Amino acid sequence: MEWKTCSFCEGKIEPGCGKKYVKKDGSVMQFCSSKCEKNFKLGRVGRKLKWTNMFKRMNKGQ
């Protein structure tokens, strides 16, 4: 089994865990927690939230 990455925070998702969300255009989003899913549905961007791995990776040198 392979680990997947969260579409919102880029965190790792264990096999058999997490949630999948299919948008109207057919693209699939995978979330590691309900926190990520709720923030996505509220229209927030993972790059702007300090607790996400995406933010930490982009602002590593600062």
UniProtKB/Swiss-Prot annotation:
Q: Which UniProt keywords apply?
A: Metal-binding, Ribonucleoprotein, Ribosomal protein, RNA-binding, rRNA-binding, Zinc, Zinc-finger
GO MF term set: rRNA binding; structural constituent of ribosome; zinc ion binding
In residue numbers, the zinc fingers (C4-type) are: 6-36
Give the UniProt entry's GO cellular component terms. Answer: ribonucleoprotein complex; ribosome
Q: Which InterPro entries match?
A: L24e/L24_sf (IPR038630), Ribosomal_eL24 (IPR056366), Ribosomal_eL24-rel_arc (IPR055345), Ribosomal_eL24-rel_N (IPR000988), Ribosomal_eL24_CS (IPR023442), TRASH_dom (IPR011017)
Cofactor: binding details: Binds 1 zinc ion per subunit.
Biological process terms from the Gene Ontology for this record are: translation
Which residue ranges traverse the bilayer? Answer: none
Is RNA-binding among the key words of this record?
A: yes
Against SUPFAM superfamilies, the record matches this protein to: Glucocorticoid receptor-like (DNA-binding domain) (SSF57716)
List ligand-binding residues for Zn(2+).
Answer: 6, 9, 32, 36
Q: What cofactors does the UniProt entry give for this protein?
A: Zn(2+)
UniProt lists the family membership as follows: Belongs to the eukaryotic ribosomal protein eL24 family.
Query: Self-association or partners: how does it assemble?
Result: Part of the 50S ribosomal subunit. Forms a cluster with proteins L3 and L14.
Q: What does this protein do?
A: Binds to the 23S rRNA.
Question: What HAMAP family does the record tag this protein with?
Answer: Ribosomal_eL24 (MF_00773)
Q: Which PANTHER family match?
A: 60S RIBOSOMAL PROTEIN L24, RIBOSOMAL PROTEIN L24
This protein's name: Large ribosomal subunit protein eL24
Gene source species: Methanococcus vannielii (strain ATCC 35089 / DSM 1224 / JCM 13029 / OCM 148 / SB)
Q: What is the lineage of its organism?
A: Archaea, Methanobacteriati, Methanobacteriota, Methanomada group, Methanococci
